[in-house]
A protein has these predicted regions:
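Active-site proximal loops enriched in glycine and acidic residues that flank catalytic Cys/His/Asp
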Residues: 1, 78, 96
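Generic secondary-structure signature for well-ordered alpha-helical cores
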Residues: 27-35, 72, 111-118
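Intrinsically disordered, low-complexity acidic/polar segments
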Residues: 9-11, 58, 85, 101
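Short glycine- and Lys/Arg-enriched binding-loop motifs that mark or flank ligand-binding interfaces
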Residues: 6, 27, 76, 82, ...
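Glycine-rich active-site loop/lid that clamps phosphate-bearing ligands
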Residues: 42, 49-83
Length: 120
């Protein structure tokens, strides 16, 4: 898919890259030099997991559980949208030196936002 705008798949850049996709977009439109695409913290991975709506999701009420499940460095982004099944309501980004651990933590935070019980 080609999008001439910032796209959902690049939302990880908000927390993981030196220059986010939003800033890059503005720089390109304004004919400014593009910023660095490097990760903010060398030697780490930025993992993003989307929060999709379900019939029982109430993400704003589960923020504390999500931050706890995601651990240090987990960033929760809620878009303030009305909950509908399948609708993207937000995302969680975790930056970690271990990509498998980052993915596990991001998934745990999204599960907490959905109101699901921890699986460990």
């Amino acid at each position: 898919e080609l999008a001439m705008r910032p796209h959902n798949t690049g939302h990880w850049t908000i927390d993981g890259a030196v220059t986010s996709q939003f800033e890059q977009h503005l720089r390109a439109v304004l004919d400014l030099p593009l910023g660095s695409t490097q990760l903010r913290t060398p030697g780490t991975y930025a993992v993003m997991v989307n929060l999709l709506g379900s019939s029982h999701a109430q993400p704003a009420r589960a923020l504390a559980a999500a931050f706890s499940a995601g651990g240090a460095g987990a960033k929760v982004h809620l878009y303030g949208k009305e909950v509908r099944p399948g609708r993207k309501l937000g995302h969680v980004t975790v930056v970690d030196a271990d990509p498998a651990l980052a993915l596990e933590r991001a998934r745990a935070a999204v599960s907490a936002l959905r109101g699901e019980a921890p699986t460990d």
